Amino acid sequence: SLLDDELAHWRDAGRVAELWWRDDDAVAETPALDRLLTLQQDTGVPLALAVVPARATAGLAGRLAAAPGVSILQHGYGHVNHAFDGGKKCELGPERPPMVVLGELATGTMALERLFAAPAFAGRRLPVLVPPWNRIAPGLVPALPEIGFAGLSTYGPRQRPEPVRGLRQINTHVDLIDWKGGGGFVGENIALALLIDALAAARTRDATAVGVLSHHLVMDEGTWDFLRSLWEKISVKPGLRMSAAQELFASREARV
């Protein structure tokens, strides 16, 4: 297969491709969340779950306490669109004063600290920001380390590994949802093409981990089936490893 061909290039170069899994928009304990956590447990693939602080429930925390393979990232503040009419959806955009947006993010961090304070979450709640709709005003990024963030994760190629000192950016590259086409599965062909393209780019241009992005609340059967078969197949392929967000976002000094 084309995927095997790409992984052969990695092996020929004596390198190991890194993949990671991010799922967005967690707010409550739902049947879809249960299905997601079951998939994580069955496959053993580490999952980074982006949680919306202003909407996250105690029930969510209770359910995640028993899911040690899941780390918690901060998904904006309230997942509210503040873009002007006709603009692309964005919560962390330039429409509002930076202090207001940064204040919201800091409030969100405190909310997650309270919600995920139990010993079960030690080392699992990460100071990583996932902007809603994967968009953030560039002017806000330099202030993120000042309010406690050590990581940033959006979608697509990154401009640089560390947009500002003390902030590591690791994105997702394979979105399984066809948002423009009504929210179903993009289909196996497109998903695999995105994955192979991102792996090739990581091999030849920017040595980053490649991220697969899921959205448990909107996934149809085709998406669930693809994700399960992908993780089951990939976990046994040589030349590739699944990485936990804890490893990816650890400081370079800590990883050496």
Briefly describe each language-model feature range.
Residues 96-175, 219-226:
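Catalytic domains of cell-wall/extracellular-matrix polysaccharide-remodeling enzymes
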